[in-house]
Amino acid sequence: MIITTTMHIENKPVQEYKGIVFGEVVEGRNFVKDFMSGIRDIVGGRSGSYEDSLMSARQAALDGMSQRASKMGANAIIGVSFQYSTVGAQNGMLMITCNGTAVVV
């Protein structure tokens, strides 16, 4: 599956548009990670645990979107974008969504 943020794939013209596809992930925050992240922020370090969680969640959203596109008969997704927001009580969860257009190239 080709996945790109652009609307065109070089040397691969779109043959058929299949429709809009989405991927969603909602991840709860972990108290220990929050505590350690706060300590790192105080001393100026980066929060590796949050970065790892974010990368994992983003990949899960992409995987879900890719699976949906594949079920539609697509072999590529163009125009992909991501949105990040916090949801839940006291914004305790991170929601990552991605969307794009499923196509055949």
Q: Which residues fall in each region the model found?
A:
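Short, well-ordered alpha-helical segments
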Residues: 21, 31-81
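N-terminal presequence-like segments and the immediate start of the first folded domain
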Residues: 1-33, 71-75, 86, 92-105
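Charge-dense, low-complexity polyampholytic segments
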Residues: 80-88
